[in-house]
Amino acid sequence: MNPWSAGLLGLTFSSPGEFVFRFPPETPLVGGLGLRWYGLLMAIAVLVGLLLTKALAEARHLEKEPGKASERVEILALWLVVSGFLGARLYYVLTHWSEFRDDPLSAFAIWRGGIIIHGGVLAGALALYLYCRATGINGWKYADVLTPGLILGQAIGRWGNFFNSEAYGAPILPDSRWPLRVYIPPQAREPQYSQFEFFHPIFFYESVLNLVLFALLMGMFWRFPKLKDGTWVWTYVVGYSLIRIPYEILRVSAVAYLPGTSIKAAYVASAVGLVLGIGMLIYMYRLRFDPDLEQLAAWLAERAGLELGTAADLVQRAWAIQQKHRRADLLDRVTLAMPHFPSTLAPHLSLGQRELLIRQLFCRLEGR
């Protein structure tokens, strides 16, 4: 059967096989080995995601020195790819422990397949946190520019399931007029569905929806560049959770369950992601914090020994800087505000004391 064929009613997919090419079994040393579509697609996904993330990091000017953000993304990519694959494999092993109970060492045979995206994302997030903690960079800013490349990579990588004839959806009856279907060869069918030939191509559904989420994230990136740090991350978490829940409802092949239960692990992961993501977005964009500027002026006047009118003027200037440069680092905002708080206003305060007061003022303006 052709890899895909179009008819009057829609599109039918049929995998040409899992190998791009394969050495004949009689070939010395490499007989039977070859390049798999899944591996090739994963490599393409990583490369495309890396190039996009580098471009977004530079466009966002995450580092003052040109090219520095791109270099940092390359270092981050190594951390994330390694930790992501390890996490995805560990998650698979834990949710398919019955396959490895008798031979635990086979868990290291990753070339046999078996990775789950939720584990990769969790491990990657941990690696990103540790890297940012070690280097002192703003992790949310880098996480935000990573998310479009991540979901685009997922859209590409999901086609690996097509070539492997795995992770397919519920069977489609012969008389069904549903326009999309994938042919699954007999040896790849679940035993309880062996009498069916065609199934829902959920790999295709998710790939398309991932592209929709990618377009949404990119639209947010260019249309609303001043959104709070972390907005793209939690939008991705919410969006992908919404995509994954119906995907799992249809899925009948290669299903991962919580150990000792009949509950799909992806249901739990998606439900947690959905609740956490929505909760974080609500928390980040809760009722706008409008600080009491008069109260802050009184506080600053007392702490700095200023007249109330002078303190009020300084608070107003700091508030204007806060509104205009809300995405700037705290240190950058302090630098912008310091010319408005010269030593002549408070000769009894040192430069360090004035900087500390301005820093505290900005924190109070943010409601912290």
What do the PLM-derived regions correspond to, one by one?
Residues 291-368:
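Long, low-complexity, intrinsically disordered cytosolic termini of multi-pass membrane proteins
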Residues 1-310, 363-367:
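A feature for loop-to-transmembrane-helix boundaries and adjacent hydrophobic helices
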